[in-house]
From Swiss-Prot:
It comes from the Bacteria. GO terms for molecular function: molecular carrier activity; sulfate binding. Keywords: Periplasm, Signal, Transport. It comes from Pseudomonas aeruginosa (strain ATCC 15692 / DSM 22644 / CIP 104116 / JCM 14847 / LMG 12228 / 1C / PRS 101 / PAO1). The gene is cysP. Binds thiosulfate specifically and with high affinity. Has no detectable affinity for sulfate. This is Thiosulfate-binding protein.
Amino acid sequence: MKRLFSASLLAAGLALGGAAHAAQPLLNVSYDVMRDFYKEYNPAFQKYWKAEKGENITIQMSHGGSSKQARSVIDGLPADVITMNQATDIDALADNGGLVPKDWATRLPNNSAPFTSATVFIVRKGNPKALKDWPDLLKDGVQVVVPNPKTSGNGRYTYLSAWGYVLKNGGDENKAKEFVGKLFKQVPVLDTGGRAATTTFMQNQIGDVLVTFENEAEMIAREFGRGGFEVVYPSVSAEAEPPVAVVDKVVEKKGSRAQAEAYLKYLWSDEGQTIAANNYLRPRNPEILAKFADRFPKVDFFSVEKTFGDWRSVQKTHFIDGGVFDQIYSPN
């Protein structure tokens, strides 16, 4: 455990001042594609906390595939807060050891999701395979890079967006299952998380299209430059609502509840929402969203819960061992 803990952490904190009081350090266990957001958000919160409380606070980060991160917390990684990309991964903390209460999503606004995102296609410059919408991904010879839906919320949103496309265009569940099965036959390798999938596509130059969240497109541009890819918005996307929660059993043991709760609440502040928009996450605050309207194309979103039922049902039907995904997917 000690080895896992030290290997997982990326310090994002300010150095502790000699004379100033220090607050209890916080560990935020998060998913792959949020690295850049929290690199900007954490110093902003540290400045706010110092102004409010007169204390320095160290914030440590752990990133990885969403479900793998949740499993690490269940197995003992002492996260004060968990910031995942879908509710199932926080539900798992409630179901395994009662690390959070079952009603965790009601404790903050917007079902505890401070921003939203869309699923997009990252294609090679010039879009040589003419990939514009979900059916295009099924063309002969098209290789689709997407992370594993069983370990990555990013992958689950891709799966559900493709399924929802069929339903919104008059297909039934059987047609949707067939469509998504064909889509995953186009996948050359299933990485465990969104950042690994980006490396496969951009660095290793595998695949014709990377399916990911729209904020990852901006992260790719910052890391690799804008010259090698284009962003395509498909006609339909599940609305990604990445939730956050205080891990009650950890903060009670560490005495860090006040800091942890303030850290998450500040995500809804004007500064937190502006940082979200700067990182291509759609802010909940409508005034701030309007200020950044040029970077957020209108998308035909559908709600996962209204289309598929609650996330626990989605997980049980589609993504558990032996679920629908296992039925339709076989490695190439």
